[in-house]
């Protein structure tokens, strides 16, 4: 056999042996994550806005799993906080005064002043802003969470945070807060 064939065979055998060893080591030393973190993260709104004091929803979910307060997520609101409280097994708390949003707001771009720099698009964590370079931008209000992250990067200050007009579509019906009483039927004669 030639030297090249021997080298190829030896390298192939070494690759297979090391592959088997790495596969075994990966299974043997596997690190399990906290399943509570994944469950809490699934309940959070995934806006990655940072209003809770953490850089995103995953770090906040990890903090909640480690015992941090559950009432720091303004975009999620009271409904999300109550679901997390039920999951974690703690009493629901009202949103912190510093985190609580008095009224829901959305971004509004004054299009006649917009220079199309795209800095607001890059800052928006939920892709609620449409536009492209050197063209006017606009906000999709149904997607906007009101996180306010698009306002600061705007070099011409053409973004305002405006309150949402209350309609039947935007009203918080709080259907989970309606008390339901179970009534037993009495046997009839």
Curated annotation (Swiss-Prot):
Q: Where in the cell is it found?
A: Cell inner membrane
User: Which EC numbers does the record give?
Assistant: 7.-.-.-
Q: Which intervals of the chain form a coiled coil?
A: none
Record has Membrane as a keyword:
yes
Q: Which residues bind [4Fe-4S] cluster 2?
A: 114, 117, 120, 154
Domain 4Fe-4S: from-to ranges: 32-90
Give binding positions for [4Fe-4S] cluster 1: 49, 52, 57, 73
> InterPro entries of this UniProt entry?
4Fe-4S_dom, 4Fe4S_Fe-S-bd, 4Fe4S_Fe_S_CS, Elect_transpt_cplx_RnfB/RsxB, RnfB/RsxB_Proteobac, RnfB_subfamily
- Protein name as catalogued: Ion-translocating oxidoreductase complex subunit B
């Amino acid at each position: 056999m030639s030297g090249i064939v021997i080298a190829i065979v030896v390298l192939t055998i070494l690759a297979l042996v090391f592959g088997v060893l790495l596969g075994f080591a990966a299974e043997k030393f596997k690190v399990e994550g906290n399943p509570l973190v994944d469950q809490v993260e699934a309940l959070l709104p995934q806006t990655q806005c940072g209003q809770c004091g953490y850089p995103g929803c995953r770090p906040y979910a990890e903090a909640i799993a480690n015992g941090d307060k559950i009432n720091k997520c303004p975009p999620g609101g009271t409904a999300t906080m109550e679901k997390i409280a039920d999951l974690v097994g703690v009493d629901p708390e009202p949103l912190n005064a510093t985190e609580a949003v008095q009224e829901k707001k959305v971004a509004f771009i004054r299009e006649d002043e917009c220079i199309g720099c795209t800095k607001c698009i890059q800052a928006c964590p939920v892709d609620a802003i449409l536009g492209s370079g050197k063209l006017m931008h606009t906000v999709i209000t149904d997607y906007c969470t009101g996180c306010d992250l698009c306002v600061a990067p705007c070099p011409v200050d053409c973004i305002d945070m405006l309150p949402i007009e209350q309609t039947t579509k935007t009203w918080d019906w709080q259907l989970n807060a309606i008390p339901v009483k179970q009534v037993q039927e009495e046997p009839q004669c």
